């Protein structure tokens, strides 16, 4: 427990410092991973405005700075919760990430399954959900495609937010280029849940996406503070 307390004390002490300068600074006799601690500081600085409630909870952790950058805002997560969270009992979040969407789905759905392929993300998600007292979220460490193909359980709804950057960190706008490829997976997904909620880039060609996807019922274009 001393390590955990020391970690959180360090994060709190240097919460307003420049992360880049902290990485160049020398610290003695630390009993925790310095890089991970500074990642927490940088992540909290990035989510301060879009995730104010999470930022207020000093016991929450972030698996990476990227997870904080790419996470849904509380406003958009609540909006998605209103779309499917209150209507369906079991929801599967196929692209778990930081877990913001799973957390808000779990506020109204009976059961939420969080899928993420990176073990660290899963470990942090389990820890955070425990801190947040969300015991109706099941965390599974698996590639989403592998999970879909092997899973025999049916859900009321899937949520998917495909990665929209390639290995060179360039933005992707075509659904077929994103990972996982929802165009390829849609038939399989619809056999295991009647509803799919898909988040895509604001730069997407909506008309083409409607043609590529089957049975599109609604398109929601969301803007938060002109973004």
Regions found by a protein language model. Name each.
Residues 1-227:
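SAM-dependent transferase fold signal centered on methyltransferase-like domains
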């Amino acid at each position: 427990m001393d390590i955990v307390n020391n970690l959180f004390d360090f994060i709190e002490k240097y919460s307003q410092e420049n992360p880049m300068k902290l990485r160049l600074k020398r610290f003695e006799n630390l009993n925790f991973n310095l890089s991970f601690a500074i990642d927490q500081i940088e992540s909290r600085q990035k989510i301060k405005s879009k995730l104010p409630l999470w930022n207020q909870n000093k016991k929450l952790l972030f698996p990476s700075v990227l997870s904080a950058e790419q996470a849904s805002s509380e406003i958009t997560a609540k909006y998605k919760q209103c779309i499917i969270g209150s209507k369906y009992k079991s929801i599967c979040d196929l692209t778990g990430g930081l877990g913001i969407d799973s957390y808000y789905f779990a506020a109204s759905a009976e059961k939420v399954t969080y899928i993420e392929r990176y073990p660290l993300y899963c470990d942090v998600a389990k820890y955070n959900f425990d801190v947040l007292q969300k015991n109706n979220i099941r965390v599974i460490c698996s590639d989403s495609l592998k999970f879909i193909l092997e899973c025999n359980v049916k859900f009321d709804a899937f949520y998917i937010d495909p990665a929209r950057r390639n290995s060179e960190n360039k933005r992707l706008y075509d659904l077929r280029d994103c990972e996982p490829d929802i165009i390829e997976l849609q038939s399989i997904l619809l056999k295991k849940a009647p509803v799919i909620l898909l988040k895509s880039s604001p730069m997407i060609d909506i008309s083409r996406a409607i043609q590529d996807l089957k049975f599109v019922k609604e398109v929601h274009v969301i803007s938060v503070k002109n973004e």
